[in-house]
């Protein structure tokens, strides 16, 4: 089965990349946020297994998020969750922070999304502002002030586009 792992900072485009990969396979992405799963000892692995099974039956590519949260849990839980991920019969995607440990056996596709520099962030701001029809003279001010990736830039521009009182200059952001 296909195993994709994407690591990077929040807002770096991990979700967008995994959604695109799932779409190329003719499927939708189903996000499983382990931060919302009850933390009762011995139950996390069973809960994850059940959710993965449901995703498989619905034809989704499950995307497990929040695995870094279980690193502080007891070692047994970590081992059990790793076993559930390794034995899942369908495709699976893992969304991890930069430099997180990967709880899969070799054979997965690893995509590390790098941190973007100010010029790249400026390009992302410019494209998102244009796409959402937001007039702003110089997006480089935003790129210098906010060290965020294209995912967050897109969400911010979508939100600003919905507002009736759009900021007219970078200082108002």
Which residues make up each language-model segment?
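ATP/nucleotide-binding catalytic cores
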Residues: 1-173
């Amino acid at each position: 089965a296909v195993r994709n792992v994407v690591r990077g900072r929040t807002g770096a485009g991990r979700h967008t990349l995994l959604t695109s990969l799932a779409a190329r396979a003719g499927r939708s992405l189903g996000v499983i946020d382990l931060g919302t799963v009850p933390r009762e000892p011995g139950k996390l692995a069973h809960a994850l297994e059940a959710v993965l099974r449901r995703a498989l039956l619905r034809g989704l590519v499950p995307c497990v998020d929040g695995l870094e949260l279980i690193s502080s849990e007891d070692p047994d839980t970590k081992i059990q969750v790793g076993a559930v991920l390794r034995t899942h019969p369908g495709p699976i995607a893992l969304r991890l922070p930069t430099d997180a440990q990967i709880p899969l056996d070799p054979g997965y596709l690893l995509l590390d999304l790098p941190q973007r520099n100010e010029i790249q962030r400026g390009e992302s701001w410019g494209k998102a502002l244009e796409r959402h029809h937001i007039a702003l003279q110089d997006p480089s001010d935003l790129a210098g002030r906010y060290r965020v990736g294209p995912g967050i830039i897109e969400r911010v521009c979508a939100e600003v586009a919905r507002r009736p009182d759009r900021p007219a200059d970078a200082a108002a952001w």
